[in-house]
UniProtKB/Swiss-Prot annotation:
Phylogenetic classification of the source organism: Bacteria, Pseudomonadati, Pseudomonadota, Alphaproteobacteria, Hyphomicrobiales
Subcellular location: Cell inner membrane
Gene Ontology molecular function: any one: metal ion binding
Recorded name of the encoding gene: mraY
The species this protein was found in: Bartonella henselae (strain ATCC 49882 / DSM 28221 / CCUG 30454 / Houston 1)
Pfam families listed in its UniProt record: Glycos_transf_4, MraY_sig1
Protein name: Phospho-N-acetylmuramoyl-pentapeptide-transferase
Length: 356
């Protein structure tokens, strides 16, 4: 919306700054953060009154988690509200990549909201049917992938390799849908401790904001010899809103958390990250930058598969952050060490932009 005013620079001095992606990214970050910070307390009070007992606590989880009983969930509503308002203010509303990514984020958010709703109202750890939830997620992701295919190319870029792309043809759609769904659920699995998921999400969002900006600028893309995708620079503004909203949410989610993100937020943010990775042709780099999410997801897959084969557990508890809690790490140790891992992995992922 604010981009419109840049066309009035002849009459309004200074508004030409609105045309710059870098300025709008910072503005989106500040706007979303302020919205979440200001309206967060009232949202938390409202959710607490409506939810009563809050999110159910896993009976087989660490004993320290039982003191979290009564903490409201669906904190993703705070995050998504801040992102959407800020995005509509600062993003280019004619950009197709913006709309598709927003579609994925909000659709995944609605799926997560329904899951949270069932858990809270029925006071059970199991919400939405797993098969039904995945089916809806794949439908949303496939629609997004189809649109990306229409406006872009079906190529898969490889990190560390110059000017080489694998033509996926129509396999691009199922592959991209898998990336989006897998990322959404991996972030969802990571969201198990106070503050654990939101910081790695912000780290990944910042990293992909840079990637989106560079990929959408033909001069930078040519210099770095990365795939140029016209229009993806606008995703940096959207991701800036994610970072700002994440900072605002962390104020309330810092231990001891006053609110949990819930599936409403984790599915939505993960889906958005996957969507941006597909749009910018950095799907493989996402596995590095979002390596912590991949680790959490794989730990569950390994735990389930190993148990089916041997009737034993590979980890004391999955996802893997609970394994370390069972090993004796305090919650704050797990959270901060996982934050460090996410930052290191993001730096490694960003290094692929130059190491070719």
């Amino acid at each position: 919306m604010m981009l419109f005013f840049s066309s009035l620079s002849d009459w309004l001095p200074g508004v030409s700054v609105f045309r710059y992606i870098t300025f709008r990214t910072i503005a989106a970050m500040l706007t979303s953060g302020l919205i979440v910070f200001l309206f967060g307390p009232s949202i938390i009070i409202s959710l607490k009154l409506r939810q009563g007992k809050g999110q159910p606590i896993r009976a087989d989880g660490p004993q320290t988690h039982f003191k979290k009983a009564g903490t409201p969930t669906m904190g993703g509503l705070m995050i998504l509200s801040g992102i959407v308002v800020s995005a509509f203010l600062w993003c280019n509303l004619s950009n197709i990549y913006f709309w598709v990514s927003l579609f994925v984020m909000l659709s995944f958010g609605m799926i997560g909201f329904y899951d949270d709703y069932l858990k809270v109202t029925k006071q059970t750890e199991k919400g939405f049917s797993g098969k039904a939830r995945l089916s809806l997620e794949f439908l949303v992701a496939a629609i997004a992938a189809f649109v990306f295919l229409q406006v872009g190319s079906p190529g898969l870029a490889l990190p560390f390799v110059k000017d080489y792309f694998i033509n996926l043809s129509w396999f691009f759609i199922p592959f991209s849908a898998f990336v989006i769904v897998a990322t959404g659920n991996a972030v969802n699995l990571t969201d198990g401790l106070d503050g654990l998921a939101i910081v790695p999400v912000m780290v990944a969002a910042l990293s992909f904001a840079l990637i989106a900006y560079l990929s959408g600028n033909i001069n930078f893309a040519d210099y770095l010899q990365i795939h140029y995708v016209s229009g993806t620079g606008e995703l940096a503004v959207l991701l800036g809103a994610v970072v700002g909203a994440g900072l605002g949410f962390l104020w309330f989610n810092a231990p001891p958390a006053a609110i949990f993100m819930g599936d409403t937020g984790s599915l939505a943010l993960g889906g958005l990250l996957g969507s941006v990775a597909v749009a910018t042709k950095h799907e493989i780099v996402l596995a590095l930058i979002g390596g912590l999410f991949a680790l959490e997801g794989f730990s569950v897959v390994i735990q389930v598969g190993y148990f089916k084969l041997t009737k034993k557990r590979a980890f004391l508890m999955a996802p893997i952050h609970h394994h370390f809690e069972k090993k004796g790490w305090t919650e704050s140790q797990v959270v901060i060490r996982f934050w460090i891992i996410s930052i290191v992995l993001a730096l490694i992922g960003l290094s692929t932009l130059k190491l070719r």
